[in-house]
Amino acid sequence: MTETKLDRGVIVALRVLVGWTFLYAGTWQILQNYSAAAFLNHVVTFHGFFAHFAEPAVLPYTDFLVKWGQLLIGLSLVSGLLVRLSGPFGILLMVTYYFAHMEWPFIEDHLNLFVDFHLVYAIVIVYLIAHHAGRVWGLDGAVERLPVVAHNQFLKSLFAANAPEEYPAIPDTVVGETK
């Protein structure tokens, strides 16, 4: 697979833009002390499932996981650090929001049939994981070359293990190595 500068630029743009969306949402919710209770209690199609997350004993955990999860997913995508680890959580969150916004067969505003931006974001994150986006002008490539990571298969798998060598992303000098 041959990558051009344009291809890498698109991967970085998608990663940073989707990451910013998560980062901003998480930051706003933390600063505003947002609670998901009203949102969860007004879900239509899967109300029984989502109502459990709004129960008084569970809601503080739901709020914490949503706020801080969005913030951490956003930081990961914007920086390109641990994209393979945070990506599936971003997909899970977007698919969960997708089903929470359904009023079968429509999505929330009745202008969309089946598809809304949550589903699009989930697919973009799948694309980013598949293309080792953390290695493309992100920190995954640099961290993967650190000796402690390079010699530990588990740690290496958290970054961009098995990524094509055409994603060198950040020069080795960034992590202190000289050639």
Q: Where are the predicted features?
A:
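Extended, low-polarity transmembrane helix blocks
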Residues: 1-42, 49-72, 79-179
